[in-house]
């Protein structure tokens, strides 16, 4: 049986959730992300696509990008936009797009379970993809 445990998440305070929320980093390139954050200083894209806050000629995998991501995450936290839950929890979420609803549960899993295929990899969770 796979290990699946609650954890203390770091997340936006409710009043800032809409401002921090962003599309996933891997659905847009750096230029699209730069455009998406115009006028949105709290967007999480400043953390998970931090090259947008550096000169355009910086390689997205350069160490300076990771340093900038850390700086931006710390700024969100230190300026009071994020909170960490006091007690471990499981987190339920629902995404709705084009009339389809998808519900999920977030918790902590064991890396050993992942590496030993106790947990199915994201790409192989449907029979038609195996």
Describe the function of each predicted region:
Residues 1-129:
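A cross-family signal for N-terminal binding/gating loops and helix N-caps
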């Amino acid at each position: 049986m796979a290990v699946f445990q609650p954890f203390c998440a770091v997340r936006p305070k409710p009043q800032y959730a809409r401002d921090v929320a962003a599309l996933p980093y891997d659905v847009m390139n750096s230029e699209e992300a730069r455009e998406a954050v115009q006028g949105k200083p709290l967007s999480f894209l400043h953390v998970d696509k931090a090259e947008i806050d550096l000169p355009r000629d910086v390689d997205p995998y350069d160490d300076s990008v990771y340093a900038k991501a850390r700086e931006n995450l710390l700024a969100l936290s230190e300026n009071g936009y994020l909170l960490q839950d006091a007690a471990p929890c499981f987190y339920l979420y629902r995404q709705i797009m084009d009339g389809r609803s998808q519900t999920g549960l977030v918790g902590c899993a064991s890396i050993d379970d992942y590496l030993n295929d106790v947990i199915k990899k994201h790409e192989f969770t449907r029979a038609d993809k195996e």
